[in-house]
Amino acid sequence: MSVELWQQCVELLRDELPAQQFNTWIRPLQVEAEGDELRVYAPNRFVLDWVNEKYLSRVLELLDEHGNGLAPVLSLLIGSKRSSAPRAAPNAPLAAAASQAQAAPVASTPAPAPSKSSAKKNAAENEEPSRDSFDPMAGASSQQAPIRAEQRTVQVEGALKHTSYLNRTFTFENFVEGKSNQLARAAAWQVADNPKHGYNPLFLYGGVGLGKTHLMHAVGNHLLKKNPNAKVVYLHSERFVADMVKALQLNAINEFKRFYRSVDALLIDDIQFFARKERSQEEFFHTFNALLEGGQQVILTSDRYPKEIEGLEERLKSRFGWGLTVAVEPPELETRVAILMKKADQAKVDLPHDAAFFIAQRIRSNVRELEGALKRVIAHSHFMGRDITIELIRESLKDLLALQDKLVSVDNIQRTVAEYYKIKISDLLSKRRSRSVARPRQVAMALSKELTNHSLPEIGDVFGGRDHTTVLHACRKINELKESDADIREDYKNLLRTLTT
């Protein structure tokens, strides 16, 4: 009965709609019935969305009018009809089978059913995008309840959701805050708590493994917590490029634009990969403008300051600076210890404070490497059946510790500082006391104290045979200047990033 009812409705739609619209949107739909359920299959996500948005209210009206008051349960899915029915999901009348079809409910507040004449008018005014369309949701696994239509009443048990690709484990609650990331965390929270009215765009930059992606996911998760129906999409910049290439291949660039410009928040990681991709930059430029003009939130990350991204158009660099640009720095010692203690607590592992301090002193580059080292220590402890001690840490991380000592040496620090300040290494070792030499020398000594395991006398010895009190004075002086002098603070951060990345 349901299939015959559907065919009757299709014939009525054929009379109502222009031939091109009917052939593009209605004819490709396939249908199968099981009991009082009518399953309508669209060939891809875009056709499904378009039918949902433009024609569903009229379809439901026709089913109700010609179903003698017993309209079937209607399910819109992506795929094609099969001999075997999709499996039912718990708490939902219908769910998509793994790879052949996926359930996709329509919007939560369907428009009132229009009259036949208004349906014709609205349909005629609709833009006609490509039929062979880009499917930005391909491979999504979310399963939702179908639409129900009963006695002129449309009850929607689920809402169509963009796949967010967010990692639910990255939240503000488990983000360890310290001086190095305090401003970035505060800015991210402001955006999450007050989107569209805070900083737009928010641009986070810094080296790998410092927490930029964590903060970005935390914002997205908080936005969805506040509004589960929000369209929040996270992706790597290379995914944006791949989607655009796919859209061009399918002659479906309009669908690509429609998808990315319809989100409430767009979160793109590693924006530096847009460099020298002219068509991608062109498309993102217009997408970026459309989102900001529409009041939608944009968050971007990069491994460097936007002005320093070579191969990126100046107009993009300029727009990235419209909102707030914040650096995420390598964590200082106290923050590294706090991260280790928190991760150990989450893993329900007893990590002595002195052991955490030992690891944090030697693993300085980024949080990702720090967590990796802790996992190795925990695994070693578990397999050996021993408590975590400094001795066990030395055993489990011996290759990593040896590599760290080799990479960050006093010689390397002296060479890097000399290049940065455009002086000679011999100047750092000389007795010259002019500020242009003395200040870089003090910076190099402070970095040597922080990044190596050498004692103060050993550091003084390799800086021209200076006394350990001279090294101590240099370290204290640089710490004071980092608080009061923005130039010294920026120089020190840049050098620290260079030496530990």
From Swiss-Prot:
Region named Disordered: 103-150
Stretches for region Domain III, AAA+ region: 165-381
Entry binding sites for ATP: G209, G211, K212, T213
Compositional bias annotation for Basic and acidic residues: 122-134
Cellular component GO terms held in the UniProt record: cytoplasm; plasma membrane
Subcellular localization, as worded in the UniProt entry: Cytoplasm
Biased composition range(s): Low complexity: 103-121
Chief localisation class: cytoplasm
Superkingdom field: Bacteria
Location of region: Domain II: 91-164
GO biological process, one term: DNA replication initiation
Function summary: Plays an essential role in the initiation and regulation of chromosomal replication. ATP-DnaA binds to the origin of replication (oriC) to initiate formation of the DNA replication initiation complex once per cell cycle. Binds the DnaA box (a 9 base pair repeat at the origin) and separates the double-stranded (ds)DNA. Forms a right-handed helical filament on oriC DNA; dsDNA binds to the exterior of the filament while single-stranded (ss)DNA is stabiized in the filament's interior.
Quaternary data: Oligomerizes as a right-handed, spiral filament on DNA at oriC.
Similarity field: Belongs to the DnaA family.
Entry text on domains: Domain I is involved in oligomerization and binding regulators, domain II is flexibile and of varying length in different bacteria, domain III forms the AAA+ region, while domain IV binds dsDNA.
HAMAP family: DnaA_bact
Protein name per the record: Chromosomal replication initiator protein DnaA
Protein's organism: Pseudomonas fluorescens (strain SBW25)
